[in-house]
C-alpha cells in the first residue's frame, strides 16, 4: 500500500492519496482550520470488491489521520447509497448530520 501527499495549488491544506495495488484508492483531505481529516474518493475495482480492500483502505486512511495529529475522521455518504452508509456504520462511523441528500458521518479515532 502506498500513500502519496499532494499539496493543492489553492493553499487551503493538503491531501494524502492511498493506493492499494492498483485496485483501490482513497483520499484524506486536511484543510487549514479544521480539526479532523476528511475521507473521500474511496474506490475499489468491481472485480476486487468484497475482499476486504475497502476496509483496509479505510484503516490506512484513519492511520494517516492519526499520524497527522488528528483524532477525528469525517466523510459524506449519499442517502441513496444505504448499503454504503451501513458499511461505514459497521466500521464505527456515526451520523452527525442529515442534509441535502447526504449523511455526514464521524468517527473518533
Report each predicted region and the residues it spans.
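Conserved active-site alpha-helix within GNAT-family acetyltransferase domains
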Residues: 55, 67, 79-97
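Acyl-donor-binding surface of acyltransferase catalytic domains
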Residues: 109
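Residues that form or flank phosphate/diphosphate-binding pockets in enzymes
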Residues: 34, 52, 83
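Acetyl-CoA-dependent GNAT
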Residues: 1-41, 45, 64, 98-100
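Conserved acetyl-CoA-binding loop-helix of GNAT-fold acetyltransferases
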Residues: 44, 50-63, 90
Amino acid at each position: 500500500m502506498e500513500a502519496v501527499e499532494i499539496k493543492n495549488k489553492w493553499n487551503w491544506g493538503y491531501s494524502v492519496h492511498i493506493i492499494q495495488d492498483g485496485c483501490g484508492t482513497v483520499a484524506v483531505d486536511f484543510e487549514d482550520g479544521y480539526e479532523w481529516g476528511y475521507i473521500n474518493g474511496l474506490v475499489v475495482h468491481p472485480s476486487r470488491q468484497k475482499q476486504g480492500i475497502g476496509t483496509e483502505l479505510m484503516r490506512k486512511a484513519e492511520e494517516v489521520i492519526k499520524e497527522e495529529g488528528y483524532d477525528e475522521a469525517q466523510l459524506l455518504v449519499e442517502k441513496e447509497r444505504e448499503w454504503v452508509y451501513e458499511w461505514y456504520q459497521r466500521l464505527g462511523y456515526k451520523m452527525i448530520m442529515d442534509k441535502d441528500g447526504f449523511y455526514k458521518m464521524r468517527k473518533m479515532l
